[in-house]
């Protein structure tokens, strides 16, 4: 059964949990400097890597998908619109049947591993993605610096390279006028809050994403 069809903890408020880690192969140029040949090498390495560590992951090149299939991944929040719009020979995903594991290949970083669950499941998602990360590091040399941690294309992700987020539905807070107070509290705890369909706007929907901000100088466990 697909993860989004299952009931989750606290799912009257928390619609889903997502944890993502960004990783790059140590001996390959980062995305901004990589040639098409480099990115094809990354793609082939990712295909081999995720085939070896298994987890039922299927390798799919975006270019080989029809537009409806690609768009369905966007609607399930597995990838974003920009990723499928810019698809060429080098972009791909690795995904399992339950769709709770989805790896983006050659988006902003070489590989972006995502784990999903319905409801509030921070510990379970972390345990799964940590297990995946350990297996990746056993098989490949990943770009890492002893001082800074994992190296990523975007400086904001350097360190753990991990983003933890929950998708929440908050219609009551908005109607009672308390939403702004909650937004201020969330930001004090080092997290962002944004409308799922655009930056926070009172005219938008009542569905919000709350991700962490800090990745440098903090452990993965402390982020959770």
Question: Locations of the language-model features?
Answer:
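Long, Pro/Ser/Thr-rich low-complexity/intrinsically disordered regulatory tracts in eukaryotic proteins
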Residues: 1-147, 154, 162, 174-176, ...
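Short glycine-/aliphatic-rich beta-strand segments at the starts of folded cytosolic domains
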Residues: 164-172
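Active-site His/Glu-centered metal-binding helix of metallohydrolases
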Residues: 158
């Amino acid at each position: 059964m697909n993860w989004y069809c299952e009931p989750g903890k606290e799912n009257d408020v928390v619609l889903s949990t997502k944890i993502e880690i960004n990783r790059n192969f140590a001996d390959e140029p980062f995305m901004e400097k990589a040639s098409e040949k480099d990115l094809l090498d990354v793609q082939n390495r990712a295909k081999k890597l995720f085939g070896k560590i298994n987890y039922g992951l299927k390798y799919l090149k975006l270019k080989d998908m029809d537009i409806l299939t690609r768009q369905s991944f966007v609607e399930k929040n597995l990838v974003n619109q920009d990723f499928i719009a810019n698809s060429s020979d080098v972009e791909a995903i690795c995904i399992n049947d339950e769709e709770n594991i989805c790896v983006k290949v050659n988006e902003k970083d070489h590989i972006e591993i995502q784990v999903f669950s319905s409801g509030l499941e921070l510990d379970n998602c972390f345990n799964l993605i940590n297990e995946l990360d350990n297996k990746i590091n056993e098989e490949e040399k990943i770009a890492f610096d002893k001082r800074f941690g994992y190296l990523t294309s975007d400086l904001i992700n350097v360190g753990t390279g991990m983003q933890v987020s929950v998708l929440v539905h908050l219609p009551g807070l908005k109607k009672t006028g308390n939403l702004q107070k909650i937004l201020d509290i969330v930001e004090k705890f080092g997290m962002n809050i944004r409308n799922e369909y655009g930056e926070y706007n009172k005219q938008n929907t009542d569905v919000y994403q709350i991700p962490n901000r800090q990745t440098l100088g903090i452990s993965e466990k402390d982020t959770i």
